[in-house]
Every structure is written in C-alpha cells, then in structure tokens.
A protein has these predicted regions:
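Loop-to-helix entry region at the N-terminal start of transmembrane alpha-helices
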Residues: 314-320
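Alpha-helical transmembrane segments
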Residues: 321-325
Length: 405
C-alpha cells in the first residue's frame, strides 16, 4: 500500500510537468505583448518557434524516458537488490550504493546532454562546446558531485545514528553550514570549469569601478569568464560576502556595448546592494529545515524503505523517498521562492534605472533575449510556478512605469 501511494505520487509529479509544458505550448500562440514585439524580426521569430518546438519535444522525451527508468527501478526494488549484493557494513554499503546509482544516473544523462548540446544547441548556433570539453565537464561534475554528496550523506547518517531524533536539529544546522560553505567557495568551483581573466583597464572597467566606489563597495577583482568555449549565451554576476568579485562572460564583453554591459552590472550590483543573496538564503534555510524534518519522519518509519525491498531503513534510499513525497510541498516552496526572486529582480532593475541605466538595461535585456531565443510569452501560471525572473515584458513595464510595481 505504501509503495503504491509513493509510486502514484511519483507518476503524478511527472504528469504535472507535462501539463505545464502543454499550458506553455497553447499560450505561446497568443500575440506577443506590445513592448517586446520588436525583439524578433520575422526570421528570428520563426527561428525561436522552431527552437522552442525542438527543445520542447526533446524535454518531453527525456522526462518520459528518465521517469520510466526510475519507475522501473522502484517497482522492481532494484535499489534494495543492488544494496544486498555488497554484504558489507552499513556505511560501506551505503557509500557503494551512492557510487553505483550516481554513476548510473550520470551514464543515463550523457546521451541526453550530448543530443541537447551537439544537435539542438548546435542547430541553432548556441553550442561552442568541443567533445573534449564535454567529456571533461562530465568527469569533473561527477567527481565533485560524488565528493560533496558523500560529505553530506555521511554527515547526515552520523548525526541521525548518533543522536537519533535530536539528530534532526544537528542535521539541519550541518546542512545549512554545508550550503554556506558551497556558496562561499562558489568561485573556486567555477574555476574548475572556467578560466577567469582580469578585465583590462579602460572605459568599461572604470565605469564598473566608479559605481562600486559610489556606494563604498570594495571589489576583489573584475573578471572576464570564458563562457564562449561552451555557448554563445551571455551572463554576469557579482558574488562574495564583504569584498565583491565581479564576473562578466566574454560573450557579454565582446558582443555588447559598454552602456549595456554597465547597465547589466548595475542590475547585478543592485542585488548586492540590497543583500538579495543573503535574504534568499534565509528562505532556503527554512526550506532545508522542513525537508530535513520530513527526512527524519521517513527514517523513523522503516516500513517505508521495507516496502521497496530493504530489510531496514536505508539512508540513501530515504532521500529518494523524500523526493517522491515532497514534490507538492517543493512546488509550494518553489512558487514562494520564485515570487521572492522576481521581487528582487524588479528591485535590481529599479536600482539600475535609478542610476540612469533604465533604457540601456532594456536594450541589454532585449538583446540577451534575442540572442538566447527566449520565450517572450510564457503562460502566467508557469511563470508563477517556475520563473525566478519576471518576463521581459513585465521587466520593461516595471522599469518604465515603476509606480505600477
């Protein structure tokens, strides 16, 4: 009975995802909002429609195949059968189980990643990744993911085993500290995949530095990241507690005018000025606490893991169960988190506009959307559930009419 309920929950989650795709599919046929109709000319508009259709079909096939594979693993108790093959201690067996299924998940994802990059993205001019970079990225992601997962998993297992129910509180604290650690060393992780070169002296660097000095914000350095070795898309970010590190994609530096780049940075600087990252972390900590409490409940009921063939509680599989039962709650958290994030985006846009970069930011956002073939007309319900940023039309309207927001 427990197994049936959990499997139904898993199936419903995937059906819900397909419903969202269908909603977007129907809504995209509506006329574009007036203030974004100049983003695509007829040729670019048709290219966007084709790109969207290809991406949608691929995403649906990927979701269906991975869901069927996962469903098969759950129905036939594959996790428990693999776990039973090891016949060693609890800790070693769990570590081996993590290694096996993380490797399995990685191998399953490789054909999809390859098709996405070297067929769809290549077809529409986005992909710049070589086979060598593609393979190296997979290896690096796998190794880093395994190390971080084992640290997190072994820590959680130790705390629950040592302190039992009280371990929930210690686990919440440990996972929060783990997330802070990952945030603090985000640049270190990025350097494993990308090369960062200091931005040369000139008009752009002077403009960025002047904005920071105006608000007494100290900078570690301003870097240009070699994003062009993987994609034609562009981005920028500002990170760090205390002294800030600014990173601009080389695609942004090479293909956008100085005023647009400064406008994009002013937006990112607005996030730093208003401490949006720190504020978002508090909500993330609350979410983590709820999920750990839910995990504690699962671990206190061995019958849940036993329904999938285990003799007792299995910590690794308990995380899988957590994803199956928590998706409705996660959707609610996602909706709240995205609402907060969209509010922060409006504030950051407003900061850039108040600095005199409103129209330059609009121009940059339009160019970014055009270059990335962004969906300019997503369904409002999908935006509410899944979009961390307002739509381009909403952002333009808010920049030009700030009193409406």
């Amino acid at each position: 009975m427990i197994k049936t309920i959990l499997l139904i929950s898993f199936i419903l989650e995937n059906i819900f995802d397909f419903i969202l795709v269908k909603l977007n599919d129907n809504y995209v046929k509506k006329p574009l909002p007036e203030n974004v109709r100049d983003v695509y000319d007829e040729e670019k508009y048709n290219k966007w429609i084709n790109y969207r259709n290809d991406s949608k079909k691929f995403s649906c096939v990927q979701t269906l195949i991975t869901a069927l594979i996962s469903l098969g693993l759950y129905i036939f108790n594959v996790h428990a059968k693999v776990f039973g093959l090891f016949g060693t201690g609890k800790i070693v067996s769990n570590i081996l189980l993590i290694l096996v299924f993380t490797l399995f998940s990685t191998l399953i994802s490789i054909p999809f990643s390859y098709y996405s990059n070297f067929v769809i993205e290549e077809k529409y001019g986005f992909n710049k990744t070589t086979i060598k970079t593609f393979i190296l990225d997979i290896v690096k992601e796998f190794l880093i993911g395994i190390v971080l997962m084992l640290i997190l998993f072994l820590g959680v297992m130790f705390l629950f085993e040592k302190f039992h129910n009280l371990g929930i509180l210690f686990t919440i604290a440990a996972v929060i500290l783990f997330n802070v650690f990952v945030s603090l060393f985000s640049m270190t992780f990025l350097r494993i995949f990308n090369k960062f070169t200091p931005l040369e002296d000139g008009e752009l660097r002077s403009s960025l530095t002047a904005l920071c000095e105006k608000y007494n914000v100290k900078i570690k350095n301003i870097y240009v990241m070699d994003a062009s070795k993987r994609t034609t898309r562009a981005n920028a970010f500002c990170t760090g507690f205390g002294k800030k590190t600014i990173s601009l994609d080389d695609n942004l530096v090479n293909n956008y005018s100085t005023d647009k780049i400064v406008a994009v940075f002013a937006h990112e600087f607005g996030h730093a000025k208003y401490k949006h990252v720190l504020k978002s972390m508090w909500f993330a900590f609350f979410r983590i606490s709820i999920l750990i409490l839910s995990l504690g409940i699962i671990l206190n009921f061995p019958v849940i893991c036993q329904a999938f063939g285990f003799e007792d509680v299995n910590y690794f599989f308990a995380f899988s169960v957590l994803t199956m039962i928590s998706w409705p709650i996660s959707r609610i958290f996602d909706m709240a988190s995205n609402k907060i994030s969209r509010t922060f985006e409006y504030q950051a846009d407003g900061f850039a506009a108040n600095e005199g970069y409103g129209e330059s930011l609009i121009g940059a956002l339009k160019q970014l959307s055009k270059d990335a073939l962004t969906n300019l007309n997503p369904h409002p319900f999908v935006v509410m559930l899944e979009y961390s940023h307002p739509t381009l039309s909403q952002r333009i309207d808010a920049i030009r009419n700030p009193k409406k927001k």
